[in-house]
Amino acid sequence: YNRNQTAIAGDRSLVSVVAHELAHSWSGNLVTNATWRDSWLNEGVTSYLEARRMEIIYDRDRVDEERVLSYEELLGNFDTVPLDRQWLAPRLESGDADDVQGTIHYHKGQLFLQYLENGFGREVFDEFLFGYFEDFAFKTITTEIFLDYLEDGLLDPNPGIVSRAQVEAWMYQPGLPADAPVPSSSTLQSAADQASAWASGETELVDIPTDTWSPQASIHFINSLPANLTLEKLQLLDDAWGLSSTGNAEIARTWFIQVANRRIEIAYEPMRSYLNR
């Protein structure tokens, strides 16, 4: 679907959306998933390529922030999506795209490729990816075709790192394998600490250095606010940061989820406007 309107924040802060769509030139257009159950070959691979591109545009710290948010959204999906839909390649008897629930195929797919990169090293994994796109150019493939290619082109030539069984645990099991990577970000941890300090009254909003923050840090701050925070403090935050009127669609989405969950009625009208964009 087209996200161009929400990608225009006016400050180039949502370049990742553009990077994602550009990456579809390879995963999605050049090599296409054969069925909806193989959607991770489209969106998961694209999300991984997006992160690699963002590392070039910005730096590793920014990418770490985005990976943490992706991981947190994935865990949130696990709370609501049935176990048999948490597989990367779930059984879809109907073949209906609507049966691919949530955004698991984006985030779990990206994390799976990061797992492979971590295990085999970037140079070796990049060589595999180049070969993958070359060998399957202008073709549609299934998960099982990919797994056979992965085994022949990466697992077997580099024994003792990742087994076929470990890969299949990602494909055909709910949740995440025990050895899945857990992203971390020092800047997002700082934002979470600031959220806790402000909520407890240890610091004031004016003392929080938001001028040096990325949108991801603001999002993490909002998501880190305790559940028992008073409506008065939430309104104070909205007034100070202009959350209900922000032009950044991702920050707005995060804030309005809080508005809905916490019943912040004074922000209902801006939320309606946001939803009707």
Predicted region positions:
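Long, ordered, helix-rich scaffold segments
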Residues: 102-108, 125, 136-142, 154-277
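Hydrophobic alpha-helical and helix-loop surface patches within well-folded domains
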Residues: 1-197
